[in-house]
Amino acid sequence: MFEQRVNSDVLTVSTVNSQDQVTQKPLRDSVKQALKNYFAQLNGQDVNDLYELVLAEVEQPLLDMVMQYTRGNQTRAALMMGINRGTLRKKLKKYGMN
């Protein structure tokens, strides 16, 4: 189960462990752990385009949730994200969300 804290400038992830205890940690900690796991699986192999890989993993669900929240209003979504509407449209097209 994942939730986002609303009254903060830091996005948090809430998880429920096997003892039904809810813990919260900053989203950045989850990203860091995911990258540690990714690097552990590489076994020394070279990687290209890691930045694009990570960005796509975060950007696509961000766009999806913002578009749902704004009920498809691209102007409002762009304002909410702090990007211009043309940039938003380009990103939506990139992920086949137009």
Curated annotation (Swiss-Prot):
Tell me which residues form the DNA-binding region.
74-93
Q: What is its main location?
A: cytoplasm
**One GO biological process term:** DNA-templated transcription
A single GO molecular function, which one? protein homodimerization activity
Q: Which Pfam families match?
A: HTH_8 (PF02954)
State the oligomer form and interacting partners. Homodimer.
Q: Where is this region: Required for the stimulation of HIN-mediated recombination?
A: 17-44
Give a short account of what the protein does: Activates ribosomal RNA transcription, as well other genes. Plays a direct role in upstream activation of rRNA promoters. Binds to a recombinational enhancer sequence that is required to stimulate hin-mediated DNA inversion. Prevents initiation of DNA replication from oriC. Binds to hundreds of transcriptionally active and inactive AT-rich sites, approximately half its binding sites are in non-coding DNA, which only accounts for about 10% of the genome.
Q: Where in the cell is it found?
A: Cytoplasm, Nucleoid
Instruction: List cellular component terms (GO).
Output: cytosol; invertasome; nucleoid; nucleosome; protein-DNA complex
Q: Which UniProt keywords apply?
A: Activator, Cytoplasm, DNA-binding, Transcription, Transcription regulation
Q: What is this protein called?
A: DNA-binding protein Fis
- Which family, according to the similarity comment? Belongs to the transcriptional regulatory Fis family.
Superkingdom of this protein's organism: Bacteria
